[in-house]
Amino acid sequence: MKLYKKAAACLLTAAMAISMLTACGGGGNGGNGGNGGKPGGNTPSPLPNNPDQIVLPDIDEGGEGTGTKPTKTPIIDVNNSKLAQFDKKYAGATEFYVEMQEVDYGKDGSVARSIDGRAARKGENCYVSMATLGKNNKQQLIETLMLKNKSTWDQYLLFRSSKAAIKARSQDDVDLSLGALIANKQPTQMWSTEIKVGPTKYYAEVYKYYSYEYTTCFTADGNPVYQFVRDLNEKQLISATLYKTIQAGSGTSKGLCALPTGTKTYSFDDNTGSLTDAKGNVFTLKENGTTGFKVYDQAGNDVTNDFKWLTDFFKMMSGQ
């Protein structure tokens, strides 16, 4: 694969990873709220490393519990569910901040991957970051900004410490709302139940979406705290999400929804393997057997050292 195709693949992978985080509807904690319209609630325990510490209802169409499994009760009017009420309460929120942790489990029940994610919105602009740690203990940190540009949103991959950003793609629509972070589509059939996470019991609501079952736990004041996803075909828990912080209202986005001062922006041409900065200067990527690639300016000067952040990014995305 040509270098610029590899670069394009890395950029796309990073952009898609962020899209998956925001579109999956996973997550949960209404903790750390306070006054001024911010959701509040108790601070939950960290996600268990052992999924056996999470006691969920049986996977079936019925509602009766079996043995130590909790019972599911149909919610007659899903519009009165805590999930729907949360979505309704914050449907118009144009500034917020969410901090979450997700754990993905392997078929043997062990932790296959953990993700620490943050999402923020202010007006039409959005920010999402995710730090991923796999079984190889190698961490990937991806930050992205979706900035409104006339009728579309430009998505930038942000390299904060190097004060650089690459435009990865443009989108016609961005749905980053508090409700969408919990459930990307409001279900039409739901059940209520009570489940245990470690020693603590929580009121929870269950619904199915395609071949997956979602169980969302709530604090006493109606804020999401955990969400668990099970594969209905494999009949096993595949992920658990904890919302560590949910805040809504003026000032809660923490200044994340804009490019940091002094950031240099670049667009990437995946047909030519070149970067173009805001002033129109073009930088070309060329393969190098020793370092992987080199970067040259329009005069043919080697400026690779000025783009070390890009080298580090490619190494991170390729697992090196």
Q: Could you say what each language-model-derived stretch is?
A:
Residues 23-126, 252-320:
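N-terminal leader/targeting segments and the immediate start of mature chains
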Residues 84-86, 186-196:
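Short amphipathic beta-strand and strand-loop transition segments with alternating hydrophobic
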Residues 70-75, 163-169, 173-175, 202, ...:
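Tryptophan-centered short beta-strand motifs
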Residues 90-97, 118-127, 146-154, 198-202, ...:
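Short, solvent-exposed coil/turn segments at beta-strand boundaries
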Residues 129-143, 195-266, 270-277, 282:
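Gly/Pro-enriched, hydrophobic low-complexity segments
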